[in-house]
C-alpha cells in the first residue's frame, strides 16, 4: 500500500538539517534543493478506508504547521507508478548498495512495521506492506517538514526504515496516587505513537479498575471504569498502540489486602502477597481477569509477579515448606497462565525478578511465556539475560526513565540505563523493550515530565545498535514536541538536569522531598546548622528565576504542549523555594527572639511571611497542574504535606512575635522495641503501660505507629489496629499511622494500654505511640512510648523494660505533633518505615552496621 503526495515544486532553497526521532535505519539525502507544496498538491493513496485516519491525522498536522487548506485526496485501487523509470526497489538499491534486499523484503519487522519514503523531484512517495508501516512513514514525513524553517518544505531523501525490535513501549504508573485522566493518557498515546512507540502498559490494574463484584477496590483513588478503558483502548488501537494491563497476580496486593475483608486471601493482614495455598484466590483472579478481558482486547496480558516478598511467610508457610518455594511459584504461575489463556489472551508476560532464582521455574514455565527483565542500573552487561535465554523463553527488557520519588527525572542516569539495557537485550535476542515510569511514595512528581524519557526510549528501541547523539536527540525532541527550534528550550532542560548532575542541591534526588517537607526548624544544634548545605544557592536561585522568565516567554510562542512548559517553570519554582527554605532554616538555627531588637525581629517575620506566600503560590499552581493531567483522587494526600509546612511557618511567626523559646516540633514519644533476638522471623511482642487518671476527661486521643501489625487494647477493650510497613503503594502509605479516640474506654484510676504487635517483616517490631488526654481542669496528660513501658513475648509475661531508639527524628525521621481535633496524624517522612524493613532483609550479622548507618543519618540530618 502507498501514499503519494504529488505536484510539489523544487525550490532554490538548500537543504536544512534533518532532525528525526527515531532516526531511520537507512537515510540518504539525494538532492540539496528543498521541495515545497503547491496549490495543485494532492494526495493519492490505495489505503483501505478503515485506515483513512492516517491521512486525516496528516491533514490535521499540516494545519498545525501552517497550511491554509487540506490537500485533496484521491483513493485508487492499484499501485501508482513513480514518474521516473526506476522502481522503488531500484531507487533503494541504487542508494543503499550495502543493504541485502532479499533479507530486507522478508524481514518480519519490515513487513509489519517498516516503510520506504522517497521525496524526489515533484513527489513524495511512502510505501509499506502494512497500515502501521504507512502510519510510521507519515510520522517521518511530518518530522521532515517540521525540520524545515517554514514547516512547508521537505528535503529530497530516500529512507528505508523498520524497527530492530518488534515491541517498543512504556509502562505508566497510574496506581500510586496520580491517576491520569483519560484525556491525558490519550495525549501520551498520541505523542508516543508519533515516535513509533507501539505498546502502552497501565500499572497496576488489579486495584485501579472498577470491578463490578468488588466496588471498594480502587474507590477514592481514581480507578478506571470499563467505559474509560474501552474508549482509551479504541483510541490507542487507532494509533497502532497496544493498550495492555499490568495486573499483579501474586505480589503488590497490599492496597487490597490492607482491607480487613480481604485479609483471608493474603499471607497476613496488609500483606504484599496473595496466599497461594488458598484456592479461593484463583476464583477472584479469574473473575477480575474476565472483567479486564472485556475491555483490554489486546493479545498481550501482563501478570506482574515481581517483588512477591511475603510468599511463604504466613498463611502459605506450611504449603510452601512442603513442596518447596520454587515449585510453589511454578504451580501458581501455571494456574495463572491457564486462567489468562482461557480469556483469550495469546501472549502472557511476567516479570523476571522472582522466577529467575529457581531452576524448576525456568524449566517448567510454558515456553511461550514472555519474561520481562527489569533493571535500573547503568551496567552494560546483564548476565541474568543470558541465564533466561538458556531456557528458550522470549525476553522483553525494561529500563526506566528514573523519575520515581524525585522532583525531576534523572536524565543522565536514565539515558545510560535505557541505552545499555536495550542494547544488551537486543544482543541477547530480546523481542522488545518497555521503558517504565514509577510513582513511588504517592507520586508527588507531575507526570508530564515522563514524556521525555519515554521518547528517548523510542529512539533506542527502534535501533539499539545505533549510538544516540544526546545533543542532536534533545534538539530533535524539543523541536518535534514543542513545534519550534528555540535554543532556550534546550537551555531549560540542560539547566534542570544539571541540578542533579552537578549536585547543586547537596542531596540525593530521592531525599529531595524528605528535606522539602521536613519541619524547617527541626533542630537547635550547631551541627544541624552545619549539615544544612546551601553553598551557591544564591546562584541556583538566580538560574531558576531566569528559567521562570524563559518559560513564561516560551509558553506564549510554542504551538504545541504549552502545559509542559508550565510544568518546567513549576519545577524551577519548586527548586527556588527549596533553596529559600534551606537558607532560612540554616539562618534561624541559632536565632533567639528574646535577644534581638524589634527591627531585626520584623525582618525575620517578613522573611518567613515571604516564604509562606511563595509556598502558597506553589501549592496553588501545583493543584492546577495536577488537575490538568490527573484525577483529583490522590491530590489531597500531597496537599496535606504542603499545608503542614504552611502551618509550621505560621507557628514560627507566632513564636517569633511572642519572643517565645524554641520548642522541639517533634513528638516526645520514642521508638521502642523489646530486643533484636527474633530478627528474620515472624514474631509477636506485647507492650504495656499503666496510666493514672484522677479527673474528668474532656478528650482523649492516641496516635499509633506499629511494626508491622499492631492491635491496640485499653482496659481489655479492643480499640483497633494499625498496619505500619514499608511499601511503595498508596493505601499502605496513607494508613501507616492511625489516630484513635479513646475517651470512652478510659476510667478513673488505673488504665492499662496493651499493644499486641506482630512483625511480619522479620524486623524488630518497633512501635511509637503518642497520646493526649485533655482534662476538664485544663491540664493535659501525655501518653508516650519510652523506657517506662514494658515488653514481653507472651501476653502473660515475663515483662521486661523495653529498649529505645529515641524520639523523632531519630530512625523514623520527623514526626510533628498530630492535629487530634481534625483527625490528622503527624506528618511523616517517606523513610519512616525503612529501618525496620531493612532489618528484615539484611543478614543478621550486619544489624549493628545498619544501626551505625541510621545513627549517621541522624547525625548528618539526612532524615529530618
Label each residue range with its predicted role.
Residues 2-30, 36-37, 45-48, 52-55, ...:
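Substrate-binding groove of N-acetylhexosamine-processing glycoside hydrolases
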Residues 1-132, 140, 144-163, 350-356, ...:
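Acidic, contiguous N-terminal accessory segments
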Residues 681-692, 735-740:
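Short beta-strands within extracellular/lumenal beta-sheet-rich domains
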Residues 51-52, 178-180, 207-211, 250-254, ...:
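Flexible loop/turn segments at secondary-structure boundaries
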Residues 660-678, 746, 752-829:
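An acidic-aromatic loop/edge-strand motif
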Residues 711-769:
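Beta-strand-rich ligand-recognition modules
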Residues 691-694, 698-713, 752-757, 799:
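Aromatic-lined ligand-binding clefts that engage carbohydrates, nucleic acids, or primary amines
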Residues 22-29, 42, 103-343, 349, ...:
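Feature activates predominantly on carbohydrate-active enzymes
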